[in-house]
Design a protein with these regions (language model features):
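Conserved beta/loop motifs at nucleotide-recognition and modification sites
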Residues: 1-158
């Protein structure tokens, strides 16, 4: 029941002042389960919990998420963390950050908290590693599953 209430609260926050909830809104929030796993994975990366990071990754693979899709979500999340960290460092409030990077207001606080676990340099390195791996996968120079594993290991080891 608690989970359902949380999901409804997210949905209400996501649609804001609109009077109608669309199927698009529901799709966006349903895909949040995978995004939530990525969020947890980034927490584990920040804490250098390599085994947990890889377990989360393999769980996503078991759920039929593609490594390339996981990489895209990881890159997106790292980009958002970087943007939030930069705007927070400039003293912007949550509402302004929400508008500037076009994410729901409820997500800004979580991203701010998580961004504090990373330096700007580490986030930049992660974004660059994701872009490089994306290129290597697309050009056939590395297997997608291995490419993502290498990034996860690189950033979660002590």
């Amino acid at each position: 029941m608690h989970t359902l209430k949380n999901e409804l609260d997210k949905l209400i926050s996501y649609v804001g002042d609109r009077k109608e909830i669309t199927s698009y809104d529901l799709e966006q929030l349903t895909s949040s389960q995978t995004i939530n796993q990525i969020f947890i994975m980034l927490d584990a990366i920040a804490r250098k919990q390599r085994d947990k990071v890889l377990t989360l990754y393999y769980d996503l693979i078991e759920l039929k998420e593609s490594p390339f899709g996981i990489l895209a979500l990881l890159a997106r999340q790292c980009n958002q963390l970087l943007q939030v960290k930069n705007l927070d460092d400039l003293g912007k409030d949550n509402g302004t950050i929400s508008k500037e990077i076009k994410i729901p207001a409820f997500a800004v606080g979580k991203l701010k908290d998580q961004s504090k676990m990373f330096s700007i340099e580490v986030l930049l390195s992660m974004v660059e590693a994701c872009a490089k791996t994306d290129e290597l996968i697309k050009t056939g120079k590395i297997n997608d599953r291995v490419g993502v594993e290498l990034i996860l290991i690189q950033f979660s080891q002590n």
